[in-house]
C-alpha cells in the first residue's frame, strides 16, 4: 500500500472522548498510567519535514522504570518507518503535563 500524506484521520470529539474514556477505564485509581503526551510543533515539523516523509507512526513503549511512553517515527510513501531519520520519545506526559479537564482526559 502506498501513502500520500493526504489520508484523512479526523473523528468527532464524542468518538475521541469515548475512545480515551475506554482506555482510562481499564486502569484502577491506584495504578499510575499515561493519558497522553505533548510534543511541540517544532519537533513534529522537524520529524515531518524529513525528505520522503509523508506521515508519522506512533508506537507504544515502556521505559526501564515501567513508565509508558510514545515513540514517534517518520513514515515514507511506501508505508515504511524511516528508521535512519529522526525518532522521538521525549514527550511531556499527562499527568503531569495535562490540559484543563475536557472530554479527552477526564
Where are these regions (language model features)?
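Detector for the mature cores of small, proteolytically processed
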Residues: 1-106
Amino acid at each position: 500500500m502506498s501513502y500520500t500524506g493526504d489520508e484523512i484521520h479526523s473523528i468527532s470529539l464524542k468518538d475521541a472522548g469515548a475512545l480515551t474514556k475506554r482506555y482510562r477505564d481499564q486502569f484502577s485509581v491506584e495504578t499510575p498510567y499515561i493519558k497522553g503526551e505533548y510534543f511541540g510543533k517544532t519537533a513534529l515539523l522537524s520529524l515531518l519535514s524529513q525528505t520522503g516523509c509523508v506521515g508519522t507512526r506512533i508506537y507504544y513503549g515502556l521505559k526501564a522504570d515501567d513508565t509508558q511512553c510514545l515513540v514517534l517515527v517518520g513514515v515514507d510513501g511506501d508505508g515504511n518507518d524511516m528508521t535512519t531519520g529522526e525518532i522521538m520519545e521525549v514527550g511531556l506526559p499527562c499527568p503531569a503535563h495535562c490540559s484543563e479537564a475536557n472530554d479527552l482526559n477526564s
